[in-house]
UniProtKB/Swiss-Prot annotation:
Species of origin: Vibrio vulnificus (strain CMCP6)
Family named by the database record: Belongs to the Gram-negative porin family.
Chief site of localization: membrane
Residues of the signal peptide: 1-21
UniProt gene name: ompU
Function noted in UniProt: Forms pores that allow passive diffusion of small molecules across the outer membrane.
Entry's Gene Ontology BP terms: monoatomic ion transport
Name assigned to this protein: Outer membrane protein U
Listed SUPFAM superfamilies: Porins
Domain of life: Bacteria
UniProt cross-references to Pfam families, sorted A to Z: Porin_4
Keywords: Cell outer membrane, Ion transport, Membrane, Porin, Signal, Transmembrane, Transmembrane beta strand, Transport
Gene3D superfamilies given in the database record: Porin
Length: 340
């Protein structure tokens, strides 16, 4: 029972470590796995090439505490490898620890908010896509967050609360006190698979300071075919101390977006396509159509080609800004990915 609970409840972290993760240690109810990926990614816009390659490395540790209770810790970091100013940067993607059992799993640290599982309905491409169902900060991957997830038969639920970051008032005298940045918030989501119909429904909500949004999603699987859609609506704070920045906006603006996705698996080849559209304050801020093909040489090694048709035109207005020629370019991406 203990081993079954652990296997089920850390499934999200197991996906991150990958099916090919190496078991470094497993003894007396304690285990440590290592996984990651090495991904070579070429991006071409207007005939100009950029190296967007990256490598990820992660560790998943688990320990049985008693019957029906376990401890878990997870870390994942990412390096970009291009020879430029960002080439030596380490992005600490995940760092969290917590407790789990029949009740689900509770963690604290840097982890995913509750809306990532909703955008995953349409975030299925090897490179492009997922550009319209934009998550506010508290619903995305963020630190200083308490998270809960649970799986109950066909129903999965997630909830997270991000604490406001502490700072001092910098008065440099006896009146100096602790303050916070006011960026606390929460996110909630639920996903339900309807029997053996192939139909799955999802929904979620997030709120942080002056920003908020809700999302609705649905998917249908029929053999080798997969179809999905996501809709989001809410408000984003582009103000001076807001969570977002855009040269065309300077206050709280309405945001509406939707994504459509389809996938067809043919042997070792997977074809995917997505359409993304979003409006900010009534202006079309995202409009693109993407297609890709991925070939799996082995389950842990794949190659792909992806093309994004940018449907925005240079000269179009977004708020008080104008879309540049660079912002309106299409993009071709070629990649090879090795999972370990």
């Amino acid at each position: 029972m203990k081993k079954t609970l652990i296997a089920l409840s850390v499934s999200a972290a197991a996906v991150a470590t990958g099916v090919n993760a190496a078991e470094l240690y497993n003894q007396d109810g304690t285990s440590l796995d290592m996984g990651g990926r090495a991904e070579a990614r070429l991006s071409m816009k207007d005939g100009k090439v950029a190296d967007n390659s990256r490598i990820r490395l992660n560790f998943l540790g688990k320990v049985e505490i008693q019957d029906g209770l376990y401890g878990v810790g997870f870390y994942e970091g990412e390096f970009t490898t291009a020879d430029n100013a960002d080439g030596s940067d380490l992005d600490n993607r995940y760092t969290y620890a917590g407790l789990g059992g029949k009740f689900g799993e509770v963690t604290y640290g840097k982890n995913d908010g509750a809306l990532g599982v909703i955008t995953d309905f349409t975030d299925i491409m090897a490179y492009h896509g997922n550009s319209a169902a934009d998550k506010i900060a508290v619903a995305d991957r963020v630190d200083n967050m308490m998270s809960y997830k649970g799986q109950f038969d066909a129903l999965s639920v997630k909830a997270s609360y991000r604490f406001a970051d502490r700072a001092d008032s910098s008065k440099n005298n006896v009146d100096n006190t602790y303050i916070d940045n006011g960026k606390d918030g929460y996110s909630l989501s639920a996903i339900y698979a309807i029997g053996q119909t192939g139909l799955t429904l999802g929904g979620g909500y997030a709120d942080q300071d002056k920003s908020n949004e809700y999302m609705l999603a649905a998917s249908y699987t029929m053999g080798d075919l997969y179809f999905a859609g996501v809709f989001t609506d809410g408000e984003k704070d582009y103000g001076t101390n807001g969570d977002y920045s855009h040269r065309g906006f300077s206050s709280v603006e309405d945001y509406t977006g939707y994504e459509l996705a389809a996938k067809y698996t043919m042997g070792q080849t997977v074809f995917t396509t997505t359409y993304n559209n979003a409006e900010t304050d009534g202006y079309t801020s995202t409009d693109n159509f993407a297609v890709d093909a991925t070939y799996y040489f082995k389950p842990n090694f794949r190659g792909y080609v992806s093309y994004n048709f940018n449907l925005l035109d240079a000269g179009d207005k977004i708020g008080t800004s104008t879309i540049s020629k660079a912002d309106a370019e299409d993009e071709l991406a070629l990649g090879l990915r090795y999972d370990f």
